UniProtKB/Swiss-Prot annotation:
One Pfam match: KARI_C
UniProt-recorded Gene Ontology molecular function terms: ketol-acid reductoisomerase activity; magnesium ion binding; NADP binding
Cofactor dependence: Mg(2+)
Chain residues that bind substrate: 252
Function of the molecule: Involved in the biosynthesis of branched-chain amino acids (BCAA). Catalyzes an alkyl-migration followed by a ketol-acid reduction of (S)-2-acetolactate (S2AL) to yield (R)-2,3-dihydroxy-isovalerate. In the isomerase reaction, S2AL is rearranged via a Mg-dependent methyl migration to produce 3-hydroxy-3-methyl-2-ketobutyrate (HMKB). In the reductase reaction, this 2-ketoacid undergoes a metal-dependent reduction by NADPH to yield (R)-2,3-dihydroxy-isovalerate.
Domain of life the protein comes from: Archaea
SUPFAM superfamilies given in the database record: 6-phosphogluconate dehydrogenase C-terminal domain-like (SSF48179), NAD(P)-binding Rossmann-fold domains (SSF51735)
Residues annotated for Mg(2+) 1 binding in this entry: 191, 195
Protein name (Swiss-Prot/TrEMBL): Ketol-acid reductoisomerase (NADP(+))
Database matches in InterPro entries: 6-PGluconate_DH-like_C_sf, KARI, KARI_C, KARI_N, KARI_prok, NAD(P)-bd_dom_sf
Binding annotation for Mg(2+) 2: 191, 227, 231
Residue ranges of coiled coil: none
Record organism: Pyrobaculum calidifontis (strain DSM 21063 / JCM 11548 / VA1)
Length: 328
């Protein structure tokens, strides 16, 4: 069973009197920085001078520095810029300025796990990965709750790396909900596999294929949209709130029977085997290598695929249907 930490298992004392540099002030960086400050901790921001993040952080009342200067001032460095920007920023601005004994925190294990970033031996390297977007991290904190998180230690120079990681988790509100101990490898691989075969790739293609089948059979695109996309949220909300079995108890008997008998024929063992192959590419590092090379070329294939997704017929129909639902 997974080890789960709660509020009582963590102490902010590990961070009291220390300077925390949040590198990046996007949605996740802003949420975590504000939560840490509201928890009574000393937070500064590292950003590009004159950029949108720089100005946003100043408006929120933070002291803002160039990344290298912020790192040099910090006892704790939180790497909250996008994954693919991190290696360059690390080499040029973070690594040369790290203090001996500093704690370096990541919100995702990608760069450490796939060796795109190699930390020096004289720092702690930890991960606190909220399992929700920055907006939820902030809103739940303000409501007196928290978003669950994963926590991991990659390098324990101080002998107290886990204590520091749990303190960060507490500072952003995650221990209110619960923090699960994991490893950088497990977090990275399960995150990528989940995105590819279920959350982004799987759901997206399931919805699109269902829409295509209904339209090809002569049904109105607008009706098809509601059946395969709009109502997907209602089902996912039930699953999120009650679990799969609870969802089944929340739909009609007709939906139960149809789903339980036809679902396994559509998502069958052949699909499961394809999922295994996709997961194996993640675990071997093949996907990471492909994505890094694509990014370094300027991501031409990604742009092409995004354009294709934008031009799928479900998008035009969806734009009109969302006007009905939410207004122009």
């Amino acid at each position: 069973m997974a080890k789960i930490y709660r509020d009582g298992d963590a102490s902010l004392d590990w961070l009291k009197g220390k300077t925390i540099a949040v590198i990046g002030y996007g949605i996740q960086g802003r949420a975590q920085a504000l939560n840490l400050r509201d928890s009574g901790l000393d937070v500064i921001i590292g950003a590009r001078r004159g950029g949108n993040s720089w100005e946003a952080a100043r408006r929120d009342g933070f002291q803002v520095y160039e990344v290298g200067e912020a790192v040099a001032k910090a006892d704790v460095v939180m790497m909250l810029i996008p994954d693919m920007e991190q290696p360059h920023v690390w080499r040029e601005q973070v690594a040369p300025n790290l203090r001996k004994g500093a704690v370096v925190d990541f919100a995702h294990g990608f760069n450490i796990h796939y060796k795109l970033i190699t930390p020096p031996p004289y720092v702690d390297v930890v991960m606190v990965a909220p399992k929700g977007p920055g907006k939820a991290v902030r809103e739940e904190f303000l409501a007196g709750r928290g978003v669950p998180a994963l926590v991991a230690v990659y390098q324990d120079y101080s002998g107290a790396a886990l204590k520091y990681a749990l303190a960060i988790a507490k500072g952003i509100g995650a221990t209110r909900a619960g923090v699960i101990e994991t490893t950088f490898a497990e977090e990275t691989e399960t995150d990528l596999i989940g995105e590819q075969v279920v959350l982004v790739g799987g759901l997206m293609e399931l919805i699109k294929k269902g829409f295509e089948v209904l339209v090809e059979m002569g049904y109105q695109p607008e009706v098809a949209y509601f059946e395969v996309l709009n109502e997907a949220k209602l089902i996912m909300d039930l699953i999120w709130q009650r679990g799969i079995y609870g969802m089944l108890n929340g739909v009609s008997d007709t939906a139960k029977y149809g789903g339980l008998t036809v679902g396994p024929r559509v998502i069958d063992d052949e699909v499961k085997e394809k999922m295994r192959r996709a997961a194996a590419r993640v675990k071997s590092g093949e996907f990471a290598k492909e994505w890094v090379e694509e990014y370094q070329r300027g991501a031409p294939r990604l742009r092409e695929l995004m354009e294709k997704a934008k031009n799928h017929p479900i998008e035009a129909v969806g734009a009109e249907m969302r006007k009905l639902l939410f207004g122009p």
